[in-house]
């Protein structure tokens, strides 16, 4: 952090670049009439100006320049002033010399930027006018700031014009404007100039400044060209000098001087385009010559050439201190956006971009005391008085014209020689200034190194303290580590024993693995043979079962059916004929008797009904009367509340029907889900069938898992050594049993899974069809129910609405109907009696008809019995022929079944005797063995006990550490003395006069190159007593460490 201010200070001493600002004006009237397009793009945020060099259509060929500030066409005067001038004005008040000058093509707004314009009709004052330029705003703010600060000040202004390489005073009180001024070098400032006869006017307020500006603008040379109607034909330099009085702490009065030069350059122009002829052409030539000289000066400053052509132009001579001197400088480059000004725009931007690299070294003007200023003024007054007296009294020197010419020639030659010598002196002074700067830099670096050395010594002391603490901690840790090494050695012995036992057990495990590999190979072979045999046997038995099932089913069906049918047919036909004949004869005999008995019963019943009809007539008359009275009461008590309940029921039915519609939608969704679920279920069942078959094949590979169990036994072997032998035997037996138990149910599981999977698939398909049919029926019923329900609700609502209105009409109709009912009952009883008489006649006719029918039916029955007996005889003969053919086919099926059974027995014997392999013991399996290994481990003593033991041996070590700290402090003192001596020799004036001299005295070597005579003693004394104790205690480890003192080396 200490080096950061010094670096900033160095950067300030190296200088500051000239600030370059670019301002682009908007299109003027002539450019609009010429239909010119814009080729310039200004980016205020990124501070970039882009120029299209290839035309309007080609947007790729661009030149981009970066400046300190960029202002576009819409920028106002106040924005330029606040961004560019306000920071510079503060530096002027601080006592710096500052310069702002505008450069650019003619007609691009240089004069507008520097001086501005007055608004029409003088609506605004100078300070409020938005068109006011930098000069009026600057003077306004100078007076504002100085009056606000309350300091005593004076402001002097001057306005100089450079026209055709001649100097003119625009503020001269004389009427002769053509009076030329002379320019001399300032003896007090080597880069400054003095203009003899230039009028400096003291201004006291802002109004005087505005009058001076108007006076100078009126005298300045302007002319009309094709490029600009009011083209400035000269350069103008407006200088503002501020004297400010300050009072020091001691009460001494000082004068602080700040100077601001505001330069408005004439525009560079193309004579062919501007239309300048004769006088205007000469003016343009002189303007371009001065601007070219300015460009060469800028190029020379950027390239740092030894000669800079300031004297080739009056303009560059005046701006000498502003370009590469001790002045804070800003350049405002003005450009045009029009396409036909592209060459001048690029030239201006190139010029401004080069000027960015000029480095100035701004310095505050020397503050003068009041006495020195008065003395300077009095000397100037006395000199002027003497000149005035000599002119009045003519006491000067008078010589001839020839001698005067010779004297002037000598003076000119001497002046040229003086100029050359001055330039040489300037070069030598620059070299001297560079050497002094290098010396000051080295001195500052030396001071910085001293401060760094002090901080490093302090850090070294702190690190020494930390070193002593770490040494003590290191001793403790070494003592503890020695104890840990001893315990580690014992643990290493026990671990080696355990490794030996592990090697023996791994050998036994490898033997077991080989046995398991043999058994696994045999088991795999048997499994493959078993699988192939099972497949063949399954196919054989399936064929046998199919043959047996088909043959037995056919035989049983044919034999049983034929025998039963034939026997039943014969017995049933005989019994049927007997029963038919007997029942027919009995029925024929009993029919007339039954009919006559039934007719007598019917006649009796008719008589009873006649008597009952008379009784029912009287009973009906009483019931009708009671019905009328009950009906009126029921209409009042039942119908009215029933109507209300019906309306409520209708509302509930509407809610129910809405719910039923939602239920129907849910049922449809459920149907879709059931369809998808059943399809997924069928797929899953097929996959289950395949997976069960594959799982049965994989279950036969469980023997391979035995090896993985043994691997896990091997991993846990190091932790369970004491239970190794017993667990191996038990697990091995368990694994063999597990293998047998797994192998037995494999076939049964396979058959059961196949049967169950087929049954499940069939059942699921049946259930799916049923569920689909039921769901379809349910949906249709629900939809039909919903439609009927809605119709019923609508009808019930209509009926209920009409029920209340029709209650009165219903009651009237009921009374009428009761009257008609009474008359109809009387009429009904009369008709009933007539009907009974008619029925009696019909029954007598029926008796006669039945007797005729019985005779005809008896003849038909006898005829059908004869036909039945003939058909039975024909069927008996055909049954006998079919039975003989079926017996022959059964004999052929039994012969094929015997053949298949014999081939199956031969395959079974071949599988049991040839295909299966046996596990023959080799005698290489390891026997059970008891392993001996250590079961207890040595532990290190607790850390607290070890540190207690160390504290008993610590006093001699503390003495040695204190001696080492004293020696290091002595070393630090010696090194500090050597460093101070070296720095004194570097800073001494002898080193400045003889930079090549080196430190060759007795104490001239740097401290880090000198040898210390007591280094070996310190190394011998640095041996740690705890290490001595360790060497004596653990001689077999032979650990010896030396502690060397800390040496620091600081390289300057």
Curated annotation (Swiss-Prot):
Coiled-coil annotated spans: 364-478, 963-988
UniProt keyword annotation of Cytoplasm present: yes
Any one Gene Ontology BP term: mitotic centrosome separation
Alphabetical list of InterPro entries matching this protein: KIF11-like, KIF11-like_kin_motor_dom, Kinesin-assoc_MT-bd_dom, Kinesin_motor_CS, Kinesin_motor_dom, Kinesin_motor_dom_sf, P-loop_NTPase
Chief location of this protein within or outside the cell: cytoplasm
GO molecular function: ATP binding; microtubule binding; microtubule motor activity; protein kinase binding
Modifications the protein undergoes after translation, according to the UniProt entry: Phosphorylated exclusively on serine during S phase, but on both serine and Thr-925 during mitosis, so controlling the association of KIF11 with the spindle apparatus (probably during early prophase).
Keyword Cell membrane part of the UniProt annotation: no
GO cellular component: ciliary basal body; cytosol; intracellular membrane-bounded organelle; mitotic spindle; protein-containing complex; spindle; spindle microtubule; spindle pole
Comp. bias (Basic and acidic residues): 1016-1026
Covalent link (Glycyl lysine isopeptide (Lys-Gly) (interchain with G-Cter in SUMO2)) residue numbers: 476
Modified-residue entries (Phosphothreonine), positions: 457, 925
Region (Disordered) residue spans: 950-1026, 1033-1052
Keywords, in A-Z order: Acetylation, ATP-binding, Cell cycle, Cell division, Coiled coil, Cytoplasm, Cytoskeleton, Isopeptide bond, Microtubule, Mitosis, Motor protein, Nucleotide-binding, Phosphoprotein, Ubl conjugation
Binding annotation for ATP: 104-111
Domain Kinesin motor residue range list: 17-358
Pfam families listed in its UniProt record: Kinesin, Microtub_bind
Subunit structure: Interacts with the thyroid hormone receptor in the presence of thyroid hormone. Component of a large chromatin remodeling complex, at least composed of MYSM1, PCAF, RBM10 and KIF11/TRIP5. Interacts with RARRES1 and AGBL2.
Annotated PANTHER family: KINESIN-LIKE PROTEIN KIF11
Record function comment: Motor protein required for establishing a bipolar spindle during mitosis. Required in non-mitotic cells for transport of secretory proteins from the Golgi complex to the cell surface.
Protein name according to UniProt: Kinesin-like protein KIF11
Taxonomic classification: Eukaryota, Metazoa, Chordata, Craniata, Vertebrata
